[in-house]
């Protein structure tokens, strides 16, 4: 009878402690996924730059070869084009592999956001109509963890779509200035706002991964 009474007296503690631990793990996962994204994105920029440089190099050679139409130069042009096609294909495959890696990272980000939403729904069910909900850590309400996760997930989803577009267009672009624009967009990641990293750092502070 006594054990049953104890079980009824403290129903919330295990739920909240599990939720807090899960949110803390999620914050660490966000940190690690963004580090992996940045590393892979930098690698992708290097590969994309190589594709753009190869295109520019070929265009320069074609301009020179137009001035000469001898049989020897035509034969050399065919060999050059064959080497170019092989090199471009290898670089495009490398860039596609990087995009596949970024896609997997973004899918994991969406899963983190979904998990955080589930924690919010569990809390809503647990507290029902109660307006006073103590924070699991310092000051953040649980719903704010989901809001930050949702914003981050959406930002990286948009950035991923942009990178896929750049990857598809870059190898077919003959305009040097357009290639440079694509490379600039890849590097600066316009959909990932500067406050995204600030939100991540705030989440790490809130969950105790960073010292206050």
From Swiss-Prot:
InterPro entries: Cyclin-dep_Kinase_2_interact
Description of post-translational modifications: Phosphorylated by CDC7 but not by CDK2.
Transmembrane stretches, start-end: none
PTM sites of type N-acetylmethionine: 1
Keyword Cell division listed: yes
Alphabetical GO biological process terms: cell division; DNA repair; DNA replication; ribosomal large subunit biogenesis
PANTHER family named in the record: CYCLIN-DEPENDENT KINASE 2-INTERACTING PROTEIN
Protein name: Cyclin-dependent kinase 2-interacting protein
Species, as recorded: Mus musculus
